[in-house]
Amino acid sequence: MFIINGEHWRVVLCSVHHPMLIRSDGSLSVGACDDASKTIYLNGNLRGDFLKKVLCHELTHAAMFSYNVELTIEQEELLAELIATYGEEIIDITNVLFYKLKERLA
């Protein structure tokens, strides 16, 4: 369990054919974020870097729900994918630059 903006969320590893991983068109998803139950569902077969990317993508959805960020579905998916793909690099660069600036300003 984890908390975002005071809301308790959980992560569930589930079967490939779990109802929450089946899209409305019948295709399968590797992850889903359900605001109503405050649950992130992940395909239990995911491993390694892809698991991390899908988890980050779904956590971004959870954060948007928890902070009442209202975007179109297309914008929401774009933001989640941006953070899942490049977020770690952005944070790493931010940390390096911040510490350099902090030392110069001290």
Q: Where do the language-model regions lie?
A:
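Metalloprotease/metallohydrolase-associated module, dominated by Zn2+-dependent proteases
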Residues: 1-50, 66-106
